[in-house]
Amino acid sequence: GPHDGTSLFSQACDNLTGAGKIFVVSAGNNGTNNVHVKKSFTATDTLLKTVVNFSTSFPQKKTWLDIWGDPSQIFKIKLSLYNVITLISETRFFTLNSTSIDTFIVGNANDTCYFKMSLIPSDYNLKPHVLIDVYSKTNRNLCLTVKANAGTVHAWTGYVSNSTGIYGSFSTTGVVGATAGNTD
């Protein structure tokens, strides 16, 4: 969910515990990883770029990108592959339209990065939401670009395999104008 108490799970916990009680959840043991990135957009500052780093403790390059915006605000996303600082390949910008997309981009060595995207606004909090399932078979840097004219977007990276949390990070590695992640 959007990590702000408005997800269906958060609402269920509120309803189950009642006044004067708390519900405690462990959110993972990734406090030193920059798993979150945030951007507040304006009419003159419309792009967030960040490099997606995969966990080195997992044999495959897999992650989920969980992206949330402000209610009634629209944003678009694009994914790109970079060879250090050179753009190799990219998708078009995708807009929220209540659909799922299964696509890929090919690097310059015929290696492939696969994406499954769900671009569906949440019925529970009216926030735009994109969930991307990434499986990369390339050694190129993966860059997430978010485009908007207003509002704030938050993104988190993480993956679960056999009940174990796998955490990479967001960074600026090699991409001009990229934003590093944080531990929020």
Enumerate the language-model features and the residues they cover:
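Loop-rich non-cytosolic ectodomains and luminal regions
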Residues: 1-184
